[in-house]
Amino acid sequence: MLNRGYAYTTIISGKDNGQTLLSHLASLYSHSTAQAWQQRLNDGEVALNGVTASGSEPVFAGQSLVWNRPPWIEPESPRHFEVLFEDPHLLAVNKPSGMPTLPGGGFMENTLLRLVQKQTPNANPVHRLGRGTSGIVLFAKTTEAAAKLSANWNTPRIQKIYRALAQGIARHDAYEILTPIGLVPHPLIGSVWAANPSGKPSKSLAKVISRTTSTQHLR
């Protein structure tokens, strides 16, 4: 799918004062080399304070930086979702596996956010699920709902339950998993959150729901 392109807008912070624009771009968007950024600058894709930039300009706090990325072909992904619940404040949808929740990693229009907002422009996700995960995503339709959900999201009032099909034979019926979670390299999208010894502390409780000869269904 060829999208319509996108204007990535940021404001220069004080810690970046005096850098050349080219150095700042290569640091801010590290997925591309300085050489690639210079080509984009030469093509007129970057503006600093509304003026097309060359890359040699020094940057200063408070300046507006815009990268007008031309249209690009997005990776394929599912484009259908199921509405599970809706009222004036909340929207709950079932996200299929393979669909990103938010733009990123080459995805812009082929995301749950864009598809939901085509039907409900005032809906904004309260949380996200990874691209490979299917399940319920909650959207707030009002600022009041967003504030209340965000305030309660990391409290015992909100419980997250995941189900997974795991390979191998589990010796026990219940597990406590304390493996730290952090960013690890990914060959296609740069990095993903996964088991990482230097990551943040995490705690998951897993219970075997059913078994086969080579797998188990966990919750």
Task: Please tell me what each predicted stretch does.
Residues 1-219:
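RNA pseudouridine synthases
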